[in-house]
Amino acid sequence: MNEQQALKKMIPPSKRREGAFLGGIIQIHVTRACDKACFGCTQGSNLGGKTGMIPLDLFEQAVISLKNYFGVVGIFGGNPALHPKFSDLCKILIKHIPFERRGLWCNNPKGNGWVMRETFNPRVSNLNVHLDKEAYDEFKRDWPESHPFGLDKDSRHSPVYVAMKDVIGDESERWRLISQCDVNQKWSAMIGVFRGELRAWFCEIAGAQSIIHQWDNEYPDTGVMVDENWWKLPMQEFSSQAKKHCHDCGVPLRGYGSLAQDESGIEQVSATHAEVYQLKRPDRAIQLVQLRSEVSEQSLKSFVSYIQNSEK
């Protein structure tokens, strides 16, 4: 399969996704900081280094760009509750987006349960506590309508930062896999801050790669400018992102990975990301993957079914 054939099968932010909340989700990434260090975190919250916080003016610009979006506007991290101006972020979101479309992706309220209750629709939020009973209890106490999960089941995270281009030489085979990517077909686009500027990506993993690599002066700025029409762009307008980030990604491999909270788990990374993949917890094991077979490819039916995958 070639690039153009793959792009025709891929889903831009403007197209409704089957099974997604309200037919679609666009995340606003507010910080990479997190109180957890889950194995294989898609947003690199298991890594050390700088963890920026989105400024309020850029956050409001991001929110305004999505006023006419049909789906959920998600607040995303990291753990968004660690943003020092979390309550101000919530006020901005309330100002521009109706309750039905306001979603939160958060593992621990960190004392913000009351403002979360006022701000977010629990039916379109994702509150995975990653086996943390204190976080679960705080959600239920301060936001009784919320639906936290992950108290009794861990999540299996497939290795995202094993770049396909490092383990699959055949570009046409990579495009074939990219055209079937679970994140593109089922998850979300993302707005975030790259080198101090607001940018948008058709995929949350593309955005994460950019944020993690942004301190490399030679790393390209692939994000699109954020205005009220950015999310309406056709997939062809995101082709430069796909050419860069999809081949630098491991999602389509559906590798077996590790349980998010498994203390004996092994992080996996390939050469493309090895320099920036410096773990927040240096005591953890890390494997430099060089062969496709090392990730136990296609062990999982779907990358995004992380709770169900914990049973495999």
Question: Can you describe what each PLM-predicted range is?
Answer:
Residues H29-R32, K50, L127, S172, ...:
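Short N-terminal micro-motifs specific to bacterial/archaeal maturation
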Residues L47, N79, K133, G207, ...:
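Flexible, active-site-proximal loop/turn residues at the rims of small-molecule/cofactor binding pockets
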Residues V63-I64, N68, L82-I211:
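Conserved AdoMet/S-adenosylmethionine-binding subsite of the radical SAM
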